[in-house]
Structures are given as C-alpha cells and as structure tokens.
Amino acid sequence: MSVRRTRKDDGSQWTVADSRSVYGIRHWGAGYFAINEAGRVEVRPNGPDSSPIDLYEQVDNLRKSGLSLPLLVRFPDILQDRVRQLTGAFDSNIARLEYQSQYTALYPIKVNQQEAVVENIIATQNVSIGLEAGSKPELMAVLALAPKGGTIVCNGYKDREFIRLALMGQKLGHNVFIVIEKESEVELVIEEAAELKVAPQVGLRVRLSSLASSKWADTGGEKSKFGLSAAQLLSVVERFRKAGLDQGIRLLHFHMGSQIANLADYQHGFKEAIRYYGELRKLGLPVDYIDVGGGLGVDYDGTHSRNASSINYDMDDYAGVVVGMLKEFCDAQSLPHPHIFSESGRSLTAHHAMLVVQVTDVEKHNDEVPKIADKESLPETVQWLVDLLGPTDIEMVTETYWRATHYMSDIATQYADGKISLAEKALGEQCYFAVCRRLYNSLKARQRSHRQVLDELNDKLADKYICNFSVFQSLPDTWAIGQVLPILPLHRLDEEPVRRAVLQDLTCDSDGKIKQYVDEQSIETSMPVHSLNEGEDYLLGIFLVGAYQEILGDMHNLFGDTDSVNIYQNPDGSVYHAGIETHDTIEDMLRYVHLSPEELMTHYRDKVASAKITPRERTYFLDALRLGLTRSSYLSS
C-alpha cells in the first residue's frame, strides 16, 4: 500500500473523512454506501443500521472464483429496502393526514426487466406492490410473474393482441387496468371485451399542459407522445358510455416525466391532474384509482438540489405532496379519496446495482521540469516559458498562468507556420505543463481569484485513465443524455487522491468517456484519483446504475454484456452469491450481427493454408483464432 500523503491546502494528514467529503458518498449513498476506516467502500444492503459488506473484498473473492472485470454487481436486498421505504412513506402520510384510501407501488418493468429485479421487488413482504407493462413482451412477463390477484397496469400503445392478453389476465384473476393512450384503442377494448365476455377495467391517461424541468420533460406536457387531450378524453368517455362500459372507467393516469428535480414543478402539474379526477367523477364515472406516474427522482450527485441529476426532496416529501394535495382537493369537492398508484421505478432500482471497472492504462502529460543546457539557442517564446519555471509569488500565480498559456498559443502558431521544429514544440509543451503543475500546487480553492485557473488546470492536467469497459454497453445514459453517476475507487481511500483523471472506455469512439463527475458538492469534468501502484489493480466503482442502464446498453464495437452477480446478505450479516452470469464471448457478439463463427473459421483455415508460414505456425495460428472466438469482448484482467 502507498504511503499516506498530506493534504495540499493545510499540510494535515489525509484521512478517510476527507475521502468521504471529496467523493460525496454520504450525500448520494442514501445510507447504503459508505467508506470504512480501512479506506474501502462498503455497502449496507438493508439500510444504514445493517451489517456492512466490504466491496473490495467481495470483488477480490469473486475474481478468484473465476469472474472477470468489468463486473456488474447487484444487491437485491436494496430493492426490497427501497420498496419498504417508498410504501412506508406513503403509508405514514396516509395515516398522518387521515387519508381514507390506500397506496400501491407499481414497478414499471421497463426500468429493468431482469428476472431477479422483478421477482425481488414483488417478493417484498407486508407491502402493496403491483407491476406495470408498456409492451407485449413486458405484458407476457408480467402475466407470469405477478402474484395471483396482483395489480397490473397496461400502458403504452396497444394492438388487438395486447388488449386481448390484458383481458385474459383479468380473467385469470389479476387486477388489470388497460390505460387508454389514444382513441383508436377504445374500439379494440370494446370488441375484445365482448369476445372474451369480460367487463374491462379501464384507465384514462390525460395529457397535462404542465411541464416539469428535467432531462425527460418531453414525456409530459402538451407535446407528450402519450395521453389524451381534453377533447379526446370526453370523446373516449362517450364511446365507452355508448357501449355500456363507462362504469369500467376506474383509473386516471398522468405522467409528468422522469427524474423531476424540483418538487414545486410536480406540485404545479399535480394540481392540474387532480382537476381531471374531479371532472371525471362529475361525469358519473366510478373513478377510484389515480396513477400519478413516475417522476420520483434519485439524488445522483448528492447535492439535494434542483440540478438535473439531483432532487430537492425525499420520498417522504414526495408522498406528503401527493397524499396531502389529493386529500385537500377531495375534501373541498366532497369526493371520495382514490386509491393511489405511483410508478417510481427509478427510485426503486437505481441504488441496487453498480459496475466495477479496472484501470488498464494511464496517459498523462509530461510535467517534469526539463533539463535545458543552452536556453539561448531556443526560440524566444520557448525561452519565455523556461523563465516561468522559476519561483512565483503567490500574488502572481494567476497572472503567470495566463502568460504561460499565451506563450503556448504562440508556440502552436509558430509550429504550424514552420518557424519552429517538432523538438522545440515538444520542449515548449513540456515547459508549459511543468509550469501548470507547479502553479496548480500553489492554488487555493478557497481563494476566489484562484478558482477559474484551478478549474482550467483541473481539466488541462487531468490524466486519461483507460478503463476496461464500454460506456455504450454499461452506462448509456452518461453519453446519451449527460447523466451524472457517482464514481470512486473501491480502495486506497485512506490516501489522498493526488491526481485528477478523465475515465475513458475501450471503444474507438470519442464519446467513449465519462464527461461529468461528482466532486464534493459540485459537478466537475474530471475526478480525483490515486497514482497507480505497480503490481496492484486499481478498481473503480460506478454506482446507481440499477435503473435503465442494463437494458438500454448497446453493442458499439461489439462489446457485450459483462460478468454479473447478485450478492445477498443473510440475517447474520454473512453473504452469498447467486444469479452469476458470465460475459458475452466474441463468438456471441459476432452471432448478434449475423456473422457465423463457423464460416469465419473456414475463412481462417483457408488463409492459414495459403499463407507462407511453417506448419508449426499454422497450428499455432488456428488454435489462437479458435480460442479467440471463445474469449470475452473485453480486455483480459
């Protein structure tokens, strides 16, 4: 283990408490993740009062058992704890406000359809939990996995077969709601209900005018892909009334968007939504359920703010708004209190999964002070940079930086114009980065005049840590929508991270890197890291990847699924592993794009046979090619 380093600002010894602050784990960890006194990340799957699990130790054991990196690690116990927290928040507010109905949490399986995820959520004891499906494949899964009598809500665009399957689910004993998203679905429901001789339970999705501020705001508001306008709503009601099925309209549904950061935005939209409830009741419809959709967010960056990757509220605040506003409206209008559904899939699943990656290589600027024998022989601009390598008064730190940057710009121009040589340009660059490194060590984050330069140098001096994973396969939201995910080393957190780095993946794509990082209470373009120790793997954990990432991942450069494992905790604190799945092989990935490994081997044999190589080489080449098809698409770890 490396020698502990001292903090640059005040000279005191670095402690684990400093790492907790720098990586913000207390803020985004939600009581599940922490740093122990040994400087390692630990997880408490059943909440902050449960027994800790040393993540670095677990990953080491899993690697020794044959699993390889990158590794997706799931903690199904966290799923059940999240369900208990969410239902507990609603139940406590229902009791506190004397609300005269109940709450059921709906899990929309589009968030993560993995069997272990769905089964662990619905297996949570002593809670009311249902499932939501938005496509025929999802509905087929839900019909099998939902407990008998369980609630199933059917959203999304529907054809005749979708509606028939939903009605079959109702006849099989499930509490099924078919939510009308567009007018053309009405006749299909009427016809299929008559064919199956079942009275359908119908929900109506309204398209709100209100729009929340979030990365997914387009899923709500007037431009939403789904939902009925006011005129369409009245038309749908009338068509069901003419068919004699209007008394089956029992649910009102709306959706304002995912990851709503500001609770005030939600309150504004909810005020509009509950007006629809009142109007539908006035039309004589027996609406007694309201599905408030998604929106309950996750504090990814730990700032507890209205940033796009944060939220300025918690589960209890959210439940209090929903229950409180509904009760106030219903009491004022003398209306019954409806049963509440919410589709809080992101909040239920985000925390339960993390990705472990290994740093395989480092690229850094040469910021060592060069040895210069004859300064006078150098171009004038390079000489000026050499002069800046000497001591600088603290008052002149920022001015020295701006001068050095100006000189470096001149050097780049002179090289392009053919006025200086490649060697002279390289020396100028080394001098420039040596000046920047020296100035960086003199800057004080607490001094306002230093902050702009400090931010620029954090970018310029950041190393490139090449990591054994694919952003596109494992963290698609980080490149697609700029999602921020917390990242930190799993070990060495009792040492100061003296470098900064940008994490880059293995793909041949300029977007194959992580561009934003949680750094204390802010978002930065690089992250604090440790220098690598020779002979020791440096492992990073990327957290809160349990929602959407696994299912949205793609195969860019033919990087496939990673190894994965579910870690469970026994009541005595011990752990066991289940659901182990190994990585996609190169052969698997080639088959995905309809390249036959058998045909490829035939081509290999033909080329080896016609090549001017020795018999021994032929055997070696064919064995290597055959073995290569069975290997992981990632680098060997």
From Swiss-Prot:
It is an enzyme of class 4 (lyase). It catalyses: L-arginine + H(+) = agmatine + CO2. InterPro entries: Ala_racemase/Decarboxylase_C, Arg_decarb_HB, Arg_decarbox_C, Arg_decrbxlase, De-COase2_CS, De-COase2_N, Orn/DAP/Arg_de-COase, PLP-binding_barrel. GO terms for biological process: arginine catabolic process; putrescine biosynthetic process from arginine; spermidine biosynthetic process. PROSITE patterns: ODR_DC_2_2. Its EC number is 4.1.1.19. One of its GO terms (molecular function) is arginine decarboxylase activity. Catalyzes the biosynthesis of agmatine from arginine. This is Biosynthetic arginine decarboxylase. It comes from Pseudomonas syringae pv. tomato (strain ATCC BAA-871 / DC3000). The gene is speA.
